[in-house]
């Protein structure tokens, strides 16, 4: 029996940056975790301030040292916040890796089995299939998914253990990606209160070609 044509597996890229603001109980951490299935191709593209909706994310991007000059409009994105810990994931822009400020991870193709949040996903996946929306499930379980965000990641960051903090964030970003992908496929996840259309990937590509790296009318 002949097998069908093989699909070339593309390594996802994850770029992570963190920015702190305030001290003690008022400490906030902005974490930018951007995922793409492709390496950046067009070095002429730049970060557009109007494409970065969340002001704290804008600070994390624009206050990087040295200043960010190159960024690349790519696939998909959303912003979530939980207990002062802000996670930005797949925002449609992949940042150029900068020494000390950014770490780039090249990972094998993602699967649920590779996620450290696999047990979390398994526990809520049956509920997600049984309900018309997964948005509430994501919100209800965000604290469990990002449980390290307020404790371990913050503690590591304050101790100067930047690599450990970024690695923990990367693991959570992968798990959250999977949960949000489930919502995107159902067309139920919302960004800034507006539903992301089922054909969000086509709309985004069209928006990028038109010079707008935002979500193409879905905001």
Task: Walk through the language-model features, giving the residues of each.
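Conserved RNase H-like, two-metal-ion catalytic cores of nucleic-acid enzymes
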Residues: 1-80
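Generic detector of well-ordered alpha-helical segments enriched in charged/polar residues
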Residues: 69-76, 95, 99, 135, ...
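Conserved DEDDh/DEDDy metal-dependent 3′-5′ exonuclease domain
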Residues: 54-132
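Acidic, Mg2+-coordinating catalytic module of metal-dependent nucleases/exonucleases
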Residues: 140-201
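Glycine-rich loops and low-complexity Gly/Arg-rich segments
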Residues: 39-42, 57-59, 110-115, 193, ...
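Internal catalytic-core helix/loop-beta-alpha segment
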Residues: 97-100, 121-159
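Acidic catalytic cores of enzymes that act on phosphate-bearing nucleotides/polynucleotides
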Residues: 196-219
